[in-house]
């Protein structure tokens, strides 16, 4: 949340959606703008935005924060950045999968890193997360401002039609993600 008034340079509304803007961002807590971001301030005073508070998945009736799972994955010594998303599952509703980008110079094999990441989530969050899949990828699709395109990745994984966002940094990454999901049998090739 950000205390009002908003600083110069922030948008006072959404294009053609002033009412929706006020309902979604200005009415939850009087005098504050609701960002739906979660983060922390480190010892040096830097603000770290870690996840969205509205990115909750439903795994067999349990509401889980993908941000909490991402936080665990980011603690792995070989992980540079990651994204967790819930993919559709007929039995459990959704299942979390992790996509991780490794730091340069990592000499462990991808399978070992994936197993270690799965075990870390099991140890810190518990078996209720049903977290069993970590895919090591080269890079994550992002907007030019650095936001990871989780919604687009989720649509690709669920084999749902998606549009390439106009703000994407490099559209070729989406093809790479699709190929990785097919290779790991998350997405059906046909």
Q: Model regions: which residues?
A:
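Short proline/glycine- and acidic-rich turn/helix-capping motifs at secondary-structure junctions
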Residues: 134-144
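AMP-binding/adenylate-forming catalytic core of the ANL superfamily
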Residues: 5-7, 12-13, 20-23, 31, ...
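A short N-terminal helical cap/helix-turn-helix that marks the beginning
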Residues: 161-169
């Amino acid at each position: 949340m950000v205390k009002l008034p908003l600083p110069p340079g922030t948008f006072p509304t959404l294009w053609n959606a002033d009412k929706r803007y006020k309902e979604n961002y200005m009415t939850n807590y009087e005098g504050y703008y609701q960002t739906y971001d979660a983060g922390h301030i480190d010892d040096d005073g830097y603000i770290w935005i870690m996840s969205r508070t509205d990115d909750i998945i439903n795994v067999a009736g349990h509401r889980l924060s993908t941000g909490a799972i991402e936080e665990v994955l980011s603690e792995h010594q070989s992980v540079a950045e990651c994204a967790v998303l819930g993919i559709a599952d007929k039995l459990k509703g959704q299942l979390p999968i992790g996509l991780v980008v490794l730091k340069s110079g990592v000499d462990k094999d991808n399978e070992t890193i994936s197993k270690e990441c799965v075990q870390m989530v099991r140890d810190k969050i518990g078996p209720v997360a049903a977290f069993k899949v970590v895919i090591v990828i080269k890079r994550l699709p992002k907007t030019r401002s650095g936001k990871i395109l989780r919604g687009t990745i989720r649509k690709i994984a669920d084999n749902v039609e998606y549009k390439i966002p106009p703000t994407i940094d490099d559209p070729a990454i989406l093809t790479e993600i699709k190929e990785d999901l097919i290779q790991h049998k998350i997405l059906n090739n046909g």
